[in-house]
Amino acid sequence: MMILITSGDYVDNELKIEFGCIPPCLLPIGNRTLIEYQAEILRKYEDKCKIFVSLPEDYQLTDIEKSMFNDIEVIIIPVPANMTLSESVLYSLNIIYESYNDNEKLFILHGDTLISHLHLEGDIIAVAQSDADYNWEKEKVDNFVWCGYFSFSRPKTFIKYLTLSKDSFVHAVRKYDEKYPLKRIHVDDWLDLGHLNTYFLSRSRITTQRAFNSMRINSGIVWKSGENSKKIEAEAYWFKNIPSMMKIFTPQLIEDGIDSKTKKYYYSLEYLPFNPL
């Protein structure tokens, strides 16, 4: 299977203020980038899939980023600046299909999108319910919006419609849908990181706990426990004993103790949606 992650432009201005001028797939989440999560999920479903990502051709990758792309085996396609999404996708697909079998199903995942449970059947559009007032493509019923994941069993036909609809990716998808109906697949775990508000909301739902720890974030509170109770207790002690003049710079400890169900030590903190250093 062939997968294109569309990340050929830079993040919007609000996100640029926070993170600088970067492509959306390189947005940080904890100690990783978004594309590392995307590639990990895709490989979980299909280990041998070929993953491509479009990046602005004027973006200068750091040595760390180059190493990361090599490690996760994602092939970079540099695309010219100032292209529409439709033009960028068409440009990328023309490069891909010069070298690879064009009979394989094509999957497209937007670079600012994370979906944990993917469907690998052909000819689908992933949709989700949303009341947010963003420029997402909407279906006619039930407030369903397109959430950035598509598949096409006839890539050549989709490329033809992209060629005829260079100014509108949506129009190309709709034209394909008229000829080969695309099944709407409802997803409950869509995370959109393409806007500042949705980025912080999404990030709070992706914890970075290690295997021996348990962490959850809910209603503005971080709850943490783990196998090593002494370590968890020591962390809680640290928060309890921060000098008063320093507490303004740290999240407030809400409670700590022994969990009644697991019998393990835990503590909970105020959740502050700040970016890590």
Where in this protein do the model-derived segments appear?
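N-terminal nucleotide-binding beta1-loop-alpha1 segment
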Residues: 1-22, 26
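A glycine-centered beta->alpha junction motif in the catalytic cores
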Residues: 9-12, 259-277
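Conserved beta-loop-beta/alpha segment of the NTase-like Rossmann-fold superfamily
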Residues: 60-134
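Conserved core of the sugar-phosphate nucleotidyltransferase
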Residues: 103, 113-185
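Short beta-strand/loop segment that forms part of the nucleotide-sugar
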Residues: 48-58
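A conserved alpha-helical element in kinase catalytic cores
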Residues: 224-264
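Short, acidic, metal-binding catalytic loop of nucleotide-sugar glycosyltransferases
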Residues: 40-48
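ATP-binding glycine-rich loop module of kinase domains
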Residues: 210-240, 270, 277
